[in-house]
C-alpha cells in the first residue's frame, strides 16, 4: 500500500512539473537589455498615483526587429530596435481619470492594446537613410489591430494571450512580455506580400 501511494505521489509530482513547463509560453532565456527595464523604472520611486504598464519584446528571431505598440487609452511610445538576442521595454504610464468610466489605467487585459507593428530585417536607426522610417508599404511588416483577441490561435500571434508572459508587480504596475520568433517573421512576409499584391491590383 505504501509503495502504491509513493508511486502515485511521484507520478503526480512529475505530471505537475511537465504541465508547468509546457504551460510556460516563455521558457527561461537570457536577452540583452537595450534600454531601461521595468525594474530600473520601479527602483526610481515612481509616483504612487500613476499606473505603470510595461511592455517588453524579446527578439528571438534571426532578423533585426523594429517594434511599436500603443494602447486604446494612450498615444503609445516610440519605435524600438532590437538585434537578435536583445530585448527592449516601453513604459505606458497613466493617471486615474475619474470622469472616464471605462478608463483602463492598469492594463491587465490585452484588449486595452490598440495595435502592434513588427518590422524585420532593416538596418539600425543610425544606418537608415535620412528621413527614412520603417513603413508597411516598403518593408517586411506584420501589423496587429486589437479589435478582438485570438486565444489559442493555431498560428503564433501577439493577439493570442497565451503567447504572453504577464507579471503583476503591484496594484500600480504590470509587465507584459512577448517573444518574437521566426514565426512572426514568416507572418510578416505573408502580410507584406498580401499588401503588395493588393497595391499592384489597385494600379
Outline where the language-model segments fall.
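N-terminal hydrophobic targeting signals that begin at the initiator methionine
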Residues: 1-2, 20
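Sec-dependent signal peptide recognition
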Residues: 2-9
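C-terminal motif of bacterial Sec signal peptides marking the signal peptidase cleavage site
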Residues: 15-18
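Intrinsically disordered, low-complexity segments enriched in small/polar residues
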Residues: 20-58, 62-203
Amino acid at each position: 500500500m505504501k509503495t502504491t501511494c509513493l508511486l502515485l505521489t511521484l507520478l503526480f509530482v512529475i505530471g505537475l512539473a511537465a504541465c508547468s513547463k509546457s504551460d510556460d509560453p516563455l521558457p527561461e532565456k537570457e536577452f540583452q537589455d537595450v534600454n531601461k527595464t521595468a525594474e530600473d523604472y520601479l527602483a526610481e520611486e515612481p509616483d504612487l498615483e500613476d499606473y505603470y504598464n510595461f511592455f517588453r519584446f524579446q527578439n528571438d528571431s534571426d532578423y533585426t526587429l523594429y517594434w511599436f505598440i500603443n494602447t486604446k487609452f494612450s498615444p503609445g511610445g516610440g519605435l524600438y530596435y532590437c538585434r537578435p538576442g536583445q530585448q527592449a521595454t516601453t513604459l505606458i504610464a497613466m493617471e486615474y481619470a475619474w470622469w472616464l468610466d471605462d478608463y483602463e489605467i492598469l492594463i491587465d487585459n490585452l484588449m486595452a492594446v490598440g495595435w502592434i507593428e513588427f518590422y524585420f530585417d532593416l538596418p539600425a536607426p543610425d544606418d537608415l537613410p535620412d528621413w527614412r522610417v520603417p513603413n508597411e508599404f516598403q518593408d517586411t511588416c506584420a501589423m496587429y489591430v486589437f479589435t478582438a483577441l485570438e486565444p489559442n490561435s493555431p498560428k503564433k500571434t501577439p493577439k493570442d494571450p497565451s503567447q504572453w508572459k504577464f507579471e503583476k508587480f503591484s496594484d500600480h504596475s504590470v509587465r507584459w512580455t512577448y517573444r518574437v520568433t521566426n514565426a512572426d517573421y514568416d507572418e510578416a512576409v505573408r502580410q507584406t506580400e498580401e499588401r503588395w499584391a493588393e497595391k499592384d491590383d489597385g494600379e
